Amino acid sequence: MRSAECGISREGQSRRDAYADIPHSAFPIPHWWGGGAVRLAPEGWPFVVSGWALAALGAWGVAVWGRGMWAVEVALLVVAVWLVVFFRDPVRTGPRGERYVIAPADGRIVDVAVVDEPMYLKAPATRISIFMSVFDVHVNRYPAAGTIELLRYNPGKFLHAAAEKASLDNEQASVGIRTARGPLLVRQIAGLIARRIVTDATPGQRVGQGDRLGIIRFGSRVDVFVPVAGRAAVRVAVGERVRAGVTVLAESLP
């Protein structure tokens, strides 16, 4: 499998090193924005720069042709602002520890179900599905600390990400993590609008809980599979909103 086929980076460490140099904003951010200090995801810069360049071109058009260009300029400004909102990447802190499975994505819980997971866990697992709308933060995070043992891309369809069949049929990237409490699988799933999954992961790599996993561009879903044998209690319900790196999805029982 070639990394270019699915956006899985073979240069994840260099991307993370460059990403660490991007400064945070220095002012408090409202909750709807994502909470905490915020920076832009590196993958978003080409889109944001292009969006604002078009908005600037529209402003020039207004200056040259007058009010007839106002509708176009307003539309371009709306798109430019939305691109900044979409690619925001808030700094997140929350509960940490090997007994917790933390949300890997912002969004709404659309499904909690026990399913068979044959790819990595090869056992019954509780699947917790998070749907991200185009207004949610789309940077994904590791739900637990551990070592990456599996990295697999599967091409597929582009059904609506909230649909039940999306977990099986849509384009997706799966990351299997060996944690202190056993194996855990997290799956990035493309949606109706999303056409690009980026996963900064390498087999054998050690990752921290809440570290950056990647991003899915323009509306998507993330599933977490927790082995039933691990005796983890689910702490969220369908319809609940969660935040990546902050919300506890499941907690291992003593």
Feature-to-residue mapping (PLM):
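Contiguous, well-folded functional domains in the mature portion of proteins
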Residues: W32-P254
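Short, basic, low-complexity termini and linkers enriched in Ser/Thr/Gly/Pro
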Residues: M1-P30
